[in-house]
Amino acid sequence: MHEHNGFNLVYLTETDPRGSMGLAGKTVGGSGSWPGALRAIDVKTAKPAWRHEWPGVNGGGGSGGILATAGKLLFTGDASGNFVAFDATNGNPLWHSRIGGLTNAPETFAIDGRQYVLVAVGDTLYAFALGQ
């Protein structure tokens, strides 16, 4: 974990106690609900800071990895094929784009002072410019 400039939250995805959905480890049948949430925990108090319940089929859930930026934004995918930006301070969704199922973590880079978020879906690479 890394704490930077007083902003000290750790982001974890909630897991289902029944195991994985057949990708590895224990296999669970295809019926029922798969609850999911994106949570932030204050590392100084070890108490939950906020929680975002994933909407969608069978409880939704996140997909791919999570990117946290110095600008207090989080980027990840949901089970409905959306690429979602969250406010890292309160967990509120700020923006989304339906680009398909994410299986990889997004990346960030800057060109000439402008920050971009890059994410791959299948054989397509998407780049989104962040506001200035």
What feature does the model see in each segment?
Residues 35, 71, 80, 122-123:
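Surface-exposed loop/turn positions within WD40 beta-propeller blades
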Residues 34-44:
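Beta-propeller blade signature
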Residues 104-132:
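Blade-level signature of beta-propeller repeat domains, shared across WD40, Kelch, NHL, RCC1
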Residues 43-45, 88-90, 131-132:
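Short loop/turn segments that connect beta-strands within beta-propeller blades
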Residues 5, 79-80, 123, 131:
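Residue-level signature of beta-propeller blades and closely related beta-rich strand-turn architectures
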Residues 2-3, 8, 13-22, 33-35, ...:
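Extracytoplasmic beta-rich repeat domains
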